[in-house]
Amino acid sequence: MIVVLNDRQFGKNLRFLRRRHHYSRWELANIICSYPKVIRDWETGRSFDVDSVCMLNIGKLFGIPIESLIDDDLRRIYKSRK
């Protein structure tokens, strides 16, 4: 199933988490069964179509609920915890 997102928060969160955990786009794509170009398109807001399996894999990898990936500003949340 494909999930269509309405805004760029998912892409911003994905980029933040990927960089925080020191993954390249290529590495992340291999882990979640996708392609680096797809990761780039999500992060830059060029695409809002996210396969539900990829979404689940991202959530599991980073230990983040899917709802937080979509709705929350994770960068702000992580900064407030410091």
Predicted feature residues:
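The alpha-helix within a helix-turn-helix
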Residues: 18, 29, 59
